[in-house]
């Protein structure tokens, strides 16, 4: 098996290094990742400047672009040979609920799926036990690979930041959702000019049983199948009826 591995925390992040080491125990792994942290880049592509791959001494590649750029470039002519699976992560911090809209980690996996390959995104609820998440992914790939080949979904995995022996199990979950984000943060630079920072993300608003929030909060790995079709089918008939009213 040949795995393309990317992330949004950057080529030097501990998460991608730990995952690459674990995956290389049973697969050929090619790493193509951003040259710096590109968290919350979502599925953005770089269209107004060239992308410049740099091969590192260990054979990995860094790209001056987004996570989606990395996967798009790798699968559309940059890499030679067949890729069987795209894996993105391990992200430092969860991608639960609404997070998947912004997440560069999830976006890298979605780009792989868009280009007709099975794909997995994996995130850790912290910055400590990357080994736990890496082991979980290596165990799940043989079980999930056949299903992923037959669907247009990706698998979004979130792992509690616990030693592997303390993880309670795995649950298939639907996405929860967060409350609105906090206000932006207004400051002044050394010249007295106003600058702004994006504020903290909203707290979990729906973390009921069955959600990814609930699983991770209670020590379980959450697995959520995600698709790119965002159509709210249940609203289509009502919307059409409303439009048809005189």
UniProtKB/Swiss-Prot annotation:
Residues bound to a divalent metal cation: 8-9, 39, 91
Keywords: Cytoplasm, Hydrolase, Metal-binding, Nucleotide-binding
Names of required cofactors: a divalent metal cation
SUPFAM superfamilies, A to Z: SurE-like (SSF64167)
CC cofactor note: Binds 1 divalent metal cation per subunit.
Catalysed conversion reaction: a ribonucleoside 5'-phosphate + H2O = a ribonucleoside + phosphate
Keyword check for Metal-binding: yes
EC supergroup of this enzyme: hydrolase
Compartments it resides in: Cytoplasm
Record's GO cellular component terms: cytoplasm
GO MF annotation list: 3'-nucleotidase activity; 5'-nucleotidase activity; exopolyphosphatase activity; metal ion binding; nucleotide binding
Enzyme Commission number: 3.1.3.5
Primary location: cytoplasm
Disulfide bonds, paired cysteine numbers: none
Keyword Manganese among record annotations: no
Task performed by this protein: Nucleotidase that shows phosphatase activity on nucleoside 5'-monophosphates.
HAMAP family on file: SurE (MF_00060)
Matching PANTHER family: 5'-NUCLEOTIDASE SURE, 5'_3'-NUCLEOTIDASE SURE
Family: Belongs to the SurE nucleotidase family.
Protein name per UniProt: 5'-nucleotidase SurE
Organism: Histophilus somni (strain 2336)
């Amino acid at each position: 098996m040949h795995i393309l591995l990317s992330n949004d925390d950057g080529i030097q992040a501990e998460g991608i290094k730990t995952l690459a080491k674990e995956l290389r125990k049973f697969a050929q792994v090619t790493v193509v990742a951003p040259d710096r942290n590109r968290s919350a880049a979502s599925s953005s592509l770089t269209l107004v400047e060239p992308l410049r791959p740099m091969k590192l001494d260990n054979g990995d590649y860094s790209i001056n672009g987004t996570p989606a750029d990395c996967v798009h470039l790798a699968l559309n002519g940059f890499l030679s040979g067949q890729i069987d699976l795209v894996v993105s992560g391990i992200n430092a911090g969860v991608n639960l609920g609404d997070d998947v809209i912004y997440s560069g980690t999830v976006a890298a996996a979605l780009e792989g799926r868009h280009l007709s390959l099975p794909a997995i995104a994996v995130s850790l609820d912290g910055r400590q036990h990357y080994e736990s998440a890496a082991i979980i992914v290596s165990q799940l790939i043989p079980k999930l690979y056949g299903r992923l080949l037959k669907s247009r979904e990706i698998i979004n995995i979130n792992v509690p930041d616990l030693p592997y022996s303390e993880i309670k199990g795995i649950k298939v979950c639907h996405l929860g959702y967060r409350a609105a984000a906090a206000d932006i943060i207004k400051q002044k630079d050394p010249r007295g000019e106003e600058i702004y920072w994006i504020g903290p993300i909203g707290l979990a608003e729906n973390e009921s049983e069955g959600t990814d929030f609930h699983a991770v909060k209670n020590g379980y790995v959450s697995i959520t199948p995600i698709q790119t079709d965002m159509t709210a089918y249940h609203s289509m008939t009502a919307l059409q009826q409303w439009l048809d009213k005189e």
